[in-house]
Structure formats: structure tokens, C-alpha cells
A protein has these predicted regions:
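Accessory terminal and edge-of-domain segments that mediate assembly/interaction
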Residues: 1-299, 307-484
């Protein structure tokens, strides 16, 4: 006999997911409040019956579709069977989930079911946003009597293609526990609500790019012809056209409390731009991508500074990465450095075309300032102190630039199926005696940052116009989950 959780349309499935999730969250919050106020423990029998659990989303396909689509990078089945995952924050992910479900529902005739899972929601994820006020003395008791985050149950095995299919196949790369873990970390690291993140992401490794982004973003909000309606800033600042002296409101020190502060230029349709200052180093680059990936962004681009390795380069020239020498080491255990990281044609073309358009250099002239080639990413900020070994490795790789983040970001995009690209600006030439000094740095920054950032923004405009074509099949594994 059918119940209200089976044979659903995509819209019905989303409504049911939201209903079940809200039931569990409300029950967990009420139980925590009762424990804090009265010392009442949660009912163990009710917990066994699913009082605090995530909802589960399942999609089944019998393999009968005569001509399944083969050109899409997502929304495809590799074999018949039942695909399932747990879901958190279904209202936040509604547009994404609806798009994915519509593809398999209409193209494959898949059957959709929603029910309660067996995985409980950890209590820390429901406290934020509630009226609950806790102190440190309550933490031990809550951890003892309520569901908590168990790291053994959180991982990237599905995304890394390491899962072993049993009765059910994974429907998506990240289950609810992994998503909730990252959503909490994103707010902590960036200082902004996860609801404000936009699908087109720029990473930078210098604060001055932030200043330029904020200046340009404020001008866009005031422009009635611009699609951008608000700027969300690290530290909880929300800027609209009605905000008086917006740049002054943003210039306080609230963002300095956060390790990798973010700024979100928001559009009405949720297709805006997020800028994250990841500061310096591959560890930060890995960390932010680990967590940002659960939001399923459409693209992330590295727009930062690098050391130029070729004599023919000049300070202020651009480097478009076509390949990476991964000396960052932070991903070696999950993605060995001998695995090639392919460039994404759509992203490369957008960055190249954007450079031509913004710089105003026609045709072949752009090649005088734009060099394509291999970028080295190192985890050693003082690699210059091992000049002999470094120079030999650079020479063998034919590298044209060095930084500490780009290859990590590209490798994470490869792992998590997020289209990626790198356009760097040469700030010094350490192999050729042009090192970065304070006075030179200031003059360089003043002249280069605005143009470089505008190239990144223009590239996003071009990529946004690509739509679903932006997502590449070359990032799919052999047994890829159906959802993007």
C-alpha cells in the first residue's frame, strides 16, 4: 500500500522533506529546552522510532529508459537500482534539489520516495537560530544524552569514489551529516550566514582585492540597471541601496575576527558572486573548499598574486593556469600528486576572453601580458632558500608561476566536481632579482588590482551565461551519483 512518502513528484518530495526535517528539528529543540529547564531526559523509545532523525530521499530507476541522456555531467543514472541519501536544510537546498529531481523524474521516469532515515541530527546543528541559551556547564550533559557529531560517520568517500555499493547507491556526493558539519564550519570561518553564499565564487589571497570588490559592489547596488541588490559582509553587515555611507559601514574591524572572511554580492535570483579571502597557504585553500563544496557552487576561480618564474614576464602580467605542479601536499592522501588535474575548457575560454575584454588588448596583443602554462603551488613560503632544488623542479615542469593556493583549489574542484580556474597576477620575479618590497608592492597593487578583479567578474558573467554547459563530464567518476 502506498503512503504519502512514495511515488512523489519533485515538488511533493521537497514539501515532504521540509515537513519531516522541521518535525525533527522542532522535537530536538523542545527536548533540549526541557532538559535544560527541568532536567528531563529525552525518551529513548521515541528516539528509536525516529524522533530526531534526518529525512531520507530515495530515487529508483528500473533501467527502462530507451535513450537516456549521455551528454549531461549530472542528472544521469549509471545503472538501474535505488539511489538514496539523507537531507538537511531542505529549504536552503530546495532550488538545487528540485533541479536534480526534475531531471531524473522527467528524463528517466524515476520513482521518488521520502521517509525518515535512521541517522539522528546532532544537537549542535539545531541550537543556532533557536531561542536556546546554553552555558559551558551544560555541554557535557547534552553530549551524554543527545545525538552528537560522530566523525567516524562523516567523510568524503562518496566524492572520492571509494564507496562500495550494496543494496542502495549514493544519490549525492554529500549526505546530511557531512553537509551540516560543513555549514557550521562555513559560518565560523567566513563570518557570514550560509544562506548568503552565491554560486559563483572568487578566491583571493590578498586583502586589497576585498577593498576593490566592496567598492565596486557598493556602486553596483546603487545602480538601478545592475542585477545586484545587496552586499553581505563578514561580521554580519548587510548593505543595500538604502544604507547610508555603505563603505564606512563596512570598514569596521568585524571581518578581522574571521579566518577566511567572505563577501557576497547578492542577486534577486540567487546567481550572484561570493568573494572569499583565503589568505595564504594550501591548508586554508583546502579547508574552505572542503566546506564550500557542500553548497554545490557552479564555479570557483582563484584570482590572486603569484611569483613569475620566466624572464620574459613583467610585474603586472597575468598567468592563466593550464596545468599545476602540486607541491602543496595537503591532498596527497586523497588525491595523489601523480593524478592529472585537467583544465576546464569553458573556464579557460572565459578567463581568456575576459582578459581581452577588460584589458582592451585586441587579438594577439593579449599574449604580451597573458602567459599560459604550469603553475607551481608550494606549501613552503620560503622555497627561495632551497634555490637549487626549486629551480631544477621548476625547469623540469616548465612552470611559469608559483603560489601557495591555486593547485589546491583546482584539485578540490576536481575532487568535488566544481568547475575551477586560475588567473594570477605577477607581483614579483624572485628568480630574476625582482623581489617584492614594500614601496614596489604598493605601486603594483594600486595599478593592477582593479583590472584583475574586473577580469574575474567579467569571466563570471561569461560563465553564468553558459548555464548547465559549464559543468564538465570530464570530472565524473565511473560510478557517479546522479545529483550534481
Amino acid at each position: 500500500m502506498e503512503n504519502k512518502g512514495t511515488n512523489l513528484t519533485p515538488e511533493q518530495a521537497l514539501d515532504r522533506l521540509e515537513e519531516l526535517y522541521e518535525q525533527s528539528v522542532n522535537a530536538l529543540r523542545e527536548a533540549i529546552a526541557d532538559y535544560v529547564d527541568n532536567g528531563t531526559l529525552p525518551d529513548p523509545h521515541a528516539r528509536l522510532n525516529g524522533l530526531f532523525v534526518y529525512p531520507s530521499l530515495s530515487v529508483s530507476w528500473d533501467g527502462a529508459t530507451p535513450n537516456p541522456p549521455k551528454t549531461r555531467a549530472f542528472g544521469r543514472f549509471t545503472h538501474p537500482g535505488c539511489y538514496t541519501t539523507t537531507v538537511t536544510r531542505p529549504a536552503l537546498f530546495r532550488a538545487y534539489l528540485l533541479e536534480q529531481l526534475n531531471l531524473v523524474y522527467h528524463d528517466y521516469g524515476a520513482h521518488i520516495a521520502v521517509e525518515a532515515s535512521h541517522h539522528e541530527i546532532p544537537y549542535p546543528y539545531v541550537i543556532d537560530g533557536s531561542a536556546l541559551t546554553l552555558d559551558r556547564s551544560m555541554s557535557a550533559g547534552l553530549t551524554r544524552h543527545f545525538p552528537t557529531t560522530e566523525l567516524a560517520q562523516i567523510g568524503d568517500e562518496t566524492a572520492d569514489g571509494l564507496f562500495h555499493p550494496g543494496e542502495f547507491y549514493p544519490l549525492s556526493h554529500f549526505d546530511a551529516r557531512r553537509v551540516d558539519f560543513s555549514l557550521a564550519r562555513l559560518r565560523h570561518y567566513t563570518g557570514t550566514p550560509v544562506e548568503h553564499f552565491q554560486p559563483f565564487v572568487l578566491f583571493t589571497n590578498y586583502t586589497r582585492y576585498v577593498d576593490e570588490f566592496v567598492r565596486w559592489g557598493c556602486s553596483q547596488i546603487l545602480d538601478p540597471d545592475s542585477p545586484y541588490i545587496a552586499l553581505s559582509c563578514a561580521g554580519g553587515i548587510w548593505i543595500t541601496a538604502e544604507t547610508e555611507a555603505p563603505e564606512e559601514a563596512i570598514s569596521d574591524l568585524a571581518w578581522k575576527k574571521h579566518q577566511m572572511p567572505a563577501w557576497h554580492l547578492v542577486t534577486a535570483d540567487g546567481q550572484g558572486i561570493t568573494l572569499v579571502n583565503i589568505c595564504v597557504g594550501p591548508s586554508n585553500a583546502k579547508t574552505i573548499c572542503d566546506h564550500l563544496a557542500v553548497l554545490r557552487p557552479d564555479v570557483w576561480l582563484m584570482i590572486g598574486h603569484c611569483g613569475g618564474l620566466r624572464e620574459s614576464q613583467a610585474i603586472g602580467d597575468y598567468v592563466l593556469a593550464h596545468a599545476y605542479l602540486r607541491d602543496d601536499h595537503v591532498l596527497d592522501a586523497v588525491l595523489p600528486p601523480d593524478i592529472p588535474i585537467p583544465s576546464i575548457a569553458e573556464v579557460q575560454r572565459a578567463l581568456y576572453d575576459a582578459t581581452k575584454a577588460v584589458s582592451g588588448m585586441p587579438g594577439e596583443e593579449v599574449k604580451q601580458r597573458l602567459r599560459t602554462g604550469t603553475v607551481v603551488t608550494t606549501d613552503d613560503r620560503n622555497w627561495e632558500l632551497r634555490y637549487s632544488a626549486s629551480a631544477l623542479r621548476f625547469n623540469l615542469s616548465r612552470a611559469v608561476a608559483i603560489d601557495m593556493e591555486s593547485a589546491t583549489i583546482a584539485a578540490q574542484g576536481y575532487r568535488f566536481r566544481v568547475p575551477y580556474g586560475t588567473l594570477l597576477c605577477v607581483s614579483d620575479k624572485p628568480l630574476h632579482g625582482e623581489i617584492k618590497l614594500p614601496g614596489q608592492a604598493n605601486r603594483f597593487y594600486e595599478g593592477a588590482i582593479s583590472e584583475h578583479l574586473q577580469i574575474g567578474i567579467r569571466a563570471i558573467d561569461l560563465l553564468r551565461a553558459e548555464g548547465d554547459r559549464l559543468h564538465s563530464r570530464k570530472l565524473r567518476t565511473f560510478n557517479e551519483p546522479p545529483f550534481r
